[in-house]
Amino acid sequence: MILSFVFGLLLMTTQQVNTQDHLEITKDGHTVTNINRLDFSFPYTDLPIIDSNKYNQFLDKLDKQFSVEPKNASFDQHGQIIAEQAGYRIHRQSFTEQYYAYYFSQQQSKLEIPMLSVYPKVDSELLGAIRSIRIGRYVTTFNSHNKKRSTNIQLAAEAINNYVVFPGEGFSFNKVVGKRTTAKGYLRAPVIVKGEFSEDIGGGICQVSSTLYNAVDNAGLKIVQRFSHSRKVPYIPPGRDATVSWYGPDFEFKNMYNQPVLIQAKTLGNLLIIKVYSSDSIEYIPRKIPSF
């Protein structure tokens, strides 16, 4: 805001906003849109002063349209590493410099959207290194004939599978799995609400959060937040469950170790298996976890 105001003051004696010319915005040589100086100028003035709020909203819209999220390296179902993929976002500084040159030049022009590479946090080398040793594990069983509940368990397990928690980082089950919706494939299945059985979208995912809790507890990771159900659940020993709800309780832990940890989760028949891995240089203290 201050920068655009200063530019305006410097040029106000020699320049007024030309409303006839335009700037052609292109991507890979194809026209995306055409904009005029008035689109981002303060109204009721002939001075060339940019409205930074409008301009930034325009950049945000372009960024949302053309940005590509990076993809971390991961393991496939056969244990082979799938290489990482770089992402891209608009190079806002370069775009702004070119836009300012147009805005204060009184010339019709064209601007090719500059892109900036965004690299994933987890590459193939790191992923391979942190699967050296297993530091935690837990297995629970479920009724695979209950298709709706089984579907929810599988979807939640896939959401946390291959997730890497770096040293000092926290893990939130709700943030990683996201909101459970029908658009994501979640189905209505039994849940426990205030001690009573009911049905809701995503019923069954608490088995995933509970199995994860025991796996990371077995690995000696720091438990930050955990709540038990209001009644006993059949798939875990008493007091070893971790209930979650999008608008309610969450399960959280933190990696206090000196190395990243890798979560691997999968369903196999009627088994939900969650393992925690890290590099062979990790200094960890495992905990003994009760099982059925």
Indicate residue ranges for each PLM-predicted region.
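Surface-exposed, secretory/extracytoplasmic low-complexity segments enriched in Ser/Thr/Asn/Gly/Pro
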Residues: 2-3, 7-292
